[in-house]
Amino acid sequence: MATLLSARRASWRDYLELTKPKVVVLMLITSLAGMFLATRAGVSWSVLLFGNLGIGLCAGGAAVVNHVVDRRIDALMARTHKRPLAQGRVEPLPALLFALALALLGMALLLAFTNALTAWLTLASLLGYAVLYTGFLKRATPQNIVIGGLAGAAPPLLGWVAVSGHVSAEPLLLVLIIFAWTPPHFWALAIHRKEEYAKADIPMLPVTHGERYTKLHILLYTLILLAVSLLPYAIHMSGPLYLACALVLGLRFLQWAWVLYRGSRPHAAIGTFKYSIAYLFALFIALLLDHYLLLNL
């Protein structure tokens, strides 16, 4: 009876929320960048449309699994307690079937409109996030988002391979940028939500090692990110426009990390977290703009 009542309360908006659409959109921006950077010619409309749709569907499926596995944790945290599974508006079994349908459709589109390598790399990313990170690493180690961050860093590689059909050094550099970005992004949020993570018994770095230690590591990773973000220019993958944008964006990120480390602002942690999202969005847009500027010179 409870299942029936929950099912009646569920709406299409609940299922959409399970896919973490804002996160998927950011991932698809990096996937688009990978696609366009992979070629000096245009990207075919079928790869552009169905390739990104396939990647997005698989990412959404992984997000749904994350909701299912974390539903009890989500119910304990103020940030997540209104999620559909945490509130019982969607039951676990229908959610898992929805995740499976998304993943199967996404894989089918990738196999039909891109290539097998893209499909299998996407599947590996999906399993890395949904199974390795969500099912094990998140509860096992304070380095959870460092190790598990590789799965979330894959979209530019997936976009590149969808167009080129092979893996090369350039898309791996884009993966490295997101990989270096992930720790300061999530640890800033973890500082802001430290008490909630402790209540849910999630070993995030601020919970296990304290805020000062975490702030130092945010600062160090932000320095690494700044250096890594300049590599596309160093290997002639991008030009002066990207270099200028990467420096401005990276130095601003470093300023946020320094303010957080010094403890001079009461809301520096959430400010750093929010800026990190804008940073990644703007950095990959700069990559795209610079790419087409170079093509038209």
Curated annotation (Swiss-Prot):
Subcellular location: Cell inner membrane
Gene3D superfamilies documented for this protein: UbiA prenyltransferase
Pathway per the UniProt entry: Porphyrin-containing compound metabolism; heme O biosynthesis; heme O from protoheme: step 1/1
Keywords: Cell inner membrane, Cell membrane, Heme biosynthesis, Membrane, Transferase, Transmembrane, Transmembrane helix
UniProt membrane topology term: Multi-pass membrane protein
Source organism, top-level taxon: Bacteria
Catalytic EC class: transferase
Main subcellular location: membrane
Catalysed reactions, as listed in the record: heme b + (2E,6E)-farnesyl diphosphate + H2O = Fe(II)-heme o + diphosphate
PROSITE patterns: UBIA
Catalytic activity, EC: 2.5.1.141
GO terms, molecular function: protoheme IX farnesyltransferase activity
Residue intervals passing through the bilayer: 23-43, 45-65, 93-113, 117-137, 145-165, 171-191, 216-236, 241-261, 277-297
Entry GO CC: plasma membrane
Function as written in the Swiss-Prot or TrEMBL entry: Converts heme B (protoheme IX) to heme O by substitution of the vinyl group on carbon 2 of heme B porphyrin ring with a hydroxyethyl farnesyl side group.
Matching HAMAP family: CyoE_CtaB
Record-stated family: Belongs to the UbiA prenyltransferase family. Protoheme IX farnesyltransferase subfamily.
PANTHER family the record matches: 4-HYDROXYBENZOATE SOLANESYLTRANSFERASE, PROTOHEME IX FARNESYLTRANSFERASE, MITOCHONDRIAL
Miscellaneous comment as given in the Swiss-Prot or TrEMBL entry: Carbon 2 of the heme B porphyrin ring is defined according to the Fischer nomenclature.
The protein, known as: Protoheme IX farnesyltransferase 1
Gene assigned in the entry: cyoE1
